[in-house]
A protein has these predicted regions:
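Catalytic core of the metallo-beta-lactamase
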Residues: 9-14, 109-164
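Pre-active-site segment of Zn-dependent metallo-hydrolases
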Residues: 18-57, 64-72, 147-164
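Active-site environment of divalent metal-dependent phosphoester hydrolases
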Residues: 28-29, 58-62, 86-90, 108-111, ...
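Metallo-beta-lactamase
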Residues: 75, 80-137, 237-238
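Cap/insert and terminal regions of metallo-dependent hydrolase folds
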Residues: 78-81, 150-243
Length: 315
């Protein structure tokens, strides 16, 4: 198994002749210009890609512009992997773009190559994780999955019993929500994410941890202030070294690592140091359209009615 870091929550896994990439957000901003990538993504050779796994619908994972940038000539050879959902929205959209889609059954092993199996599981808030197992190495992409709720703690412990020790864990290390102007709340939220990572490591006991799914920054005039308290890759790296439960493997876009081979984090950390500094010096996004409060209230009521009509459980 080879692991190549692309950016943010995107890694390219090469195993037994198969190439699987996750959550490609390769360029541009997202969340209405509220988030931007800290570093420039490395190039993806779509002609080599067999599978694209999408964890959930948030635009830093299901990034429509990046998916639309895939050349038409490669689409026939690429299969998207996604969780089965009631609305089929992502599935239908991908098919409309001429992609093949395979919906993954919850907690079921699927063979994708000789001696290579994947397993996907749903979690609260419509997220999902992916386990890749080649018989020698188990790589778990947990991305943004909620692991502190009672429901997921139960699932995760059961999951750990089923699969045994995970060799490599990749998960989110920074908060993503808008937390307002209360500095204390932001600090507590940042610490809670590190505590969540520590809990994941306690239960799953990975040999290695790859900092993941948090290589973006708040890039809009209205949310930039939140960067001050959020966790950086340096914070999670130091946190893990102090805890001594696992070995952090910090990868920079374009870095390739073979599990159980030695890896020096210093090169990646030095590059990220420059990128963080550069990102925070860039002009802030401020081209969001402004609307008056009454207009927004009316639109929210219309949206509420639309959701009720489309959701059988709310009728």
């Amino acid at each position: 198994m080879k692991i190549k870091f692309i950016n943010h929550a995107s890694v390219l896994i090469n195993v037994n002749g198969v190439n699987l990439i996750s959550d490609p957000w390769l360029f541009g901003s997202t969340f209405y210009d509220g988030w931007s990538l800290i570093s420039k993504s490395c190039q993806v050779d779509w002609g080599e890609i067999d599978y694209v796994w999408i964890s959930h619908e948030h635009p830093d994972h299901f990034h429509v512009p990046s998916i639309k940038s895939i050349p038409e000539k490669y689409k026939a050879n690429i299969t998207f992997l996604y969780q089965s959902t009631m609305d089929n929205k992502v599935n239908n959209w991908l098919k409309s773009q001429n992609f093949k889609v395979k919906l993954l059954p919850n907690l079921k092993k699927i063979k994708i190559a000789s001696n290579v199996f994947i397993k996907s599981g749903k979690t609260p808030q419509d997220d999902s994780w992916l386990l890749i197992d080649d018989g020698k190495t188990k790589f778990l992409n947990l991305n943004d999955c909620e692991t502190k709720s009672k429901q997921f703690k139960f699932i995760m412990k059961k999951f750990a019993r089923e699969i045994g020790r995970v060799d490599i864990l990749a998960s989110q290390f920074g908060f993503a929500s808008y937390l307002g102007y209360n500095q204390t709340i932001r600090k507590k939220s940042a610490q809670s994410v590190l505590d969540k990572v520590d809990y994941q490591i306690e239960v799953l006991k990975p040999k290695y941890y790859i900092p993941f799914a948090s290589f973006s920054y708040f890039s809009h005039k209205e949310n930039f202030l939140q960067n001050k308290e959020n966790n950086s890759v340096f914070d999670v790296h130091d946190f893990l070294l102090k805890k001594r439960r696992t070995l952090p493997v910090v990868l920079y876009p374009g870095d390739t690592w073979i599990p159980y081979k030695s890896h020096n984090n210093n090169s990646a950390l030095e590059k990220y140091k420059k990128d963080y500094n550069n990102a925070f010096q860039k002009p802030l996004n401020d081209n969001t359209k402004k609307y008056n409060l009454n207009f927004l209230k009316q639109k929210s009521l219309e949206y509420k009615e639309k959701i009720i009509k489309k959701n059988v459980f709310l009728k």
